[in-house]
């Protein structure tokens, strides 16, 4: 791969995981499908923190089911490798092609998943054995 930049991910939408200043960043979300919920992520593209300069990544307008995030990252990296200008850094590429191009590359991955035996794994979060639930509680950030 020709990317040497950062990918940051947090299950929480707060900024502690610094997803918003990563070249590719994700924060946790969910997708409601009838009475069921899919663990999901919202992506940011083009963020950076270097030499005291902060650039917030642009939030994509797609929610990706958690189990489809690795494929989304692979698609974006392949897109970058094949469409970049010689020597073009990832963030410069992201700025040049725009948010919509990144959204279009993964739009089919964000399509709703109907609940069935074949799709059950999408409704279970990574390293868990039971269906995903959004559980809200008092968080550290609220103190």
Located regions from the model:
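Peripheral terminal and linker regions in Fe-S/redox and tRNA-modifying enzymes
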Residues: 3-143
């Amino acid at each position: 791969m020709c990317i040497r930049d950062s990918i940051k991910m947090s299950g929480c939408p707060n900024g502690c995981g610094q997803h918003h200043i990563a070249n590719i960043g994700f924060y946790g979300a969910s997708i409601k499908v009838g009475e069921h919920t899919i663990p999901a992520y919202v992506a940011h593209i083009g963020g950076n923190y270097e030499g005291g300069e902060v650039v917030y990544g642009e939030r994509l307008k797609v929610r990706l089911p958690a189990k489809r995030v690795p494929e989304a990252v692979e698609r974006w990296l392949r897109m970058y490798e094949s469409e970049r200008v010689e020597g073009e850094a990832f963030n410069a590429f992201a700025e040049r092609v725009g948010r919509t191009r990144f959204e279009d590359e993964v739009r089919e991955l964000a399509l709703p998943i109907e609940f069935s035996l074949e799709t059950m794994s999408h409704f279970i979060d990574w390293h868990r054995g039971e269906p995903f639930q959004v559980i809200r509680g008092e968080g550290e950030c609220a103190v």
